[in-house]
Amino acid sequence: MPSPAVDLLKQKTASLPNAPISVVAANTFVPPTQPVTAGNQLPTSVPLPVLPAVEAAKRLAAYAAVDRHIAHEHKVIGIGSGSTVPYVVDRILAQGFEANKDRVFLPTGFQSKELIVKAGLTLGDVDQYARIDVTIDGADEVDNELNSIKGGGACQLREKVLAEAADTWIIVADYRKNSEVLGTSWTKGIPIEVVPFAYAKVLTNLAHMGSPHVLPNGQPGLSLRMGKMKAGPVVSDNGNFIIDAPFAEELMRQPEELLHKIKMLTGVVEVGLFCGMAKAAYFGNEDGSVTIRSDDGTISQL
């Protein structure tokens, strides 16, 4: 007898369109003619809900990344965090029940765990699977060398573990996250996860490294991240605090060097700088196209 999880997965996949989307227009309606498989060039489109420009761009990036990087033989898949990731799960579901019934999906945090469970996909964890076929994740900002800032959702530790464990790590984002230098559009600073009893010491260390308490525009700079719907600091899924540390452009142009310096501070658990890890980054654009930056330095357009 099929398990409730199998029944849920069949239900979730049965009504989904099984065809690649068009990247000519984000909300175009054209009947599907081709199954979703990795490597498709996205020549056709399917009926999709009309979304605001930014959301449509996120969906385009996510769908293109799944179509090109999640193949039938991939059985262990990492699911990242952020506002683009729900579209990643949608596109994986569109590959159908047969493609997904033998797969296991590893989350980077509570949000992605909930997405996996609600989709009826099989949930696993990285402590069970030290090697992952593909991880697809969002980013707060990506530079032209595929270095990225992550941790706006306080998940950077698990995100980095799943990124390092993956044979292929792919970033998906909208056009606003595509920058020449980190810190250009994401001005809140580098998210740094610290053990709670060390946060004051780490704040002092970061200030000595050049992270200002007040930005030139008068906005708050270096600070312990505070909760918006609760009194007190944000607490990560691992029970730690998050510090946001902005740095000047000249330091952000050398993100790997900055990463190593911050990581050496006692009390720091993980740093939201991801350097030299991504195979490619997919950016959905306002005009319905997708820009792909690859780790070999090439830039292509869909």
Curated annotation (Swiss-Prot):
**Catalytic activity, as annotated:** aldehydo-D-ribose 5-phosphate = D-ribulose 5-phosphate
Q: Name one GO molecular function term.
A: ribose-5-phosphate isomerase activity
Disulfide bonding pattern of the chain: none
The alphabetized UniProt keywords are: Cytoplasm, Isomerase
Pfam families, per the entry: Rib_5-P_isom_A (PF06026)
SUPFAM superfamilies listed in its UniProt record? D-ribose-5-phosphate isomerase (RpiA), lid domain (SSF75445), NagB/RpiA/CoA transferase-like (SSF100950)
Q: Among the entry's GO cellular component annotations, what is one?
A: cytoplasm
Q: Name one GO biological process term.
A: pentose-phosphate shunt, non-oxidative branch
What InterPro entries does UniProt report for this protein, alphabetically? NagB/RpiA_transferase-like, Ribose5P_isomerase_type_A
Enzyme Commission numbers on file: 5.3.1.6
Biological pathway: Carbohydrate degradation; pentose phosphate pathway; D-ribose 5-phosphate from D-ribulose 5-phosphate (non-oxidative stage): step 1/1
Location comes to: Cytoplasm
For this protein, the record's NCBIfam families field holds:
rpiA (TIGR00021)
Q: Which PANTHER family match?
A: RIBOSE-5-PHOSPHATE ISOMERASE
Q: Which family does it belong to?
A: Belongs to the ribose 5-phosphate isomerase family.
**Name by which UniProt lists this protein:** Ribose-5-phosphate isomerase
In its UniProt entry, the species of origin is given as Cryptococcus neoformans var. neoformans serotype D (strain JEC21 / ATCC MYA-565)
Query: Gene behind this chain?
Result: RKI1
